[in-house]
């Protein structure tokens, strides 16, 4: 069981809501994934319409919403988006995203740390999206973040665990859950992330852009489960040379 702040999750697969062809496909894919935490961009919600086509089906599905501050260019804008989410959605959970560069969507470490400090002081449960930077992740822990969400590779790129070496360090040192976010493009990559010891993964583009999002969501669900079980079972040690599984020495000496 995964615990973030005071909430327990049976599923270690978190999902997003972007890039789906329509809301029905989105909901069916989320249900197939068994995800219990779903991120939604504040910039996509039309609060003037009340419960719009995005929020209504998500609430009916009974999943926990994790609003994100995607689109924020600095700490001030991110804090404003988080406070709006708390007021309009009734949640103090926030996925903190600050990426001023619209081309590569790289997170701004300085602004993210500042926003995280402010939001934690205001009582938010903060899950920051950041570079796979072990030092930064430790600093975010220290200011009170409930989890850290280091990227595997650029958002939506499907490149996989490009930052694996740094993710290993973050996982080793972390005292809060590590959710690997961004760039996971295949179930095998999600399984690998879990084998490393990640507490969860967040997947959106790989599911939403699939020719069959519902089937792909099921594949990711199973991959995450298998990867976690493999980690808990204990993977064999990687060797530089060959090691016989059935030595023949005794047989030859008879």
Curated annotation (Swiss-Prot):
1-deoxy-D-xylulose 5-phosphate binds at residues 156, 182-183, 204-205. The active site is at residue 95. Its EC number is 2.8.1.10. CDD domains: ThiG. Keywords: Cytoplasm, Schiff base, Thiamine biosynthesis, Transferase. It catalyses: [ThiS sulfur-carrier protein]-C-terminal-Gly-aminoethanethioate + 2-iminoacetate + 1-deoxy-D-xylulose 5-phosphate = [ThiS sulfur-carrier protein]-C-terminal Gly-Gly + 2-[(2R,5Z)-2-carboxy-4-methylthiazol-5(2H)-ylidene]ethyl phosphate + 2 H2O + H(+). One of its GO terms (cellular component) is cytoplasm. It comes from the Bacteria. Transmembrane segments: none annotated. InterPro entries: Aldolase_TIM, Thiazole_synthase_ThiG, ThiG. GO terms for biological process: thiamine diphosphate biosynthetic process. It is found in: Cytoplasm. Pathway: Cofactor biosynthesis; thiamine diphosphate biosynthesis. Catalyzes the rearrangement of 1-deoxy-D-xylulose 5-phosphate (DXP) to produce the thiazole phosphate moiety of thiamine. Sulfur is provided by the thiocarboxylate moiety of the carrier protein ThiS. In vitro, sulfur can be provided by H(2)S. Homotetramer. Forms heterodimers with either ThiH or ThiS. Belongs to the ThiG family. PANTHER family: THIAZOLE SYNTHASE. This is Thiazole synthase. It comes from Shewanella putrefaciens (strain CN-32 / ATCC BAA-453). The gene is thiG.
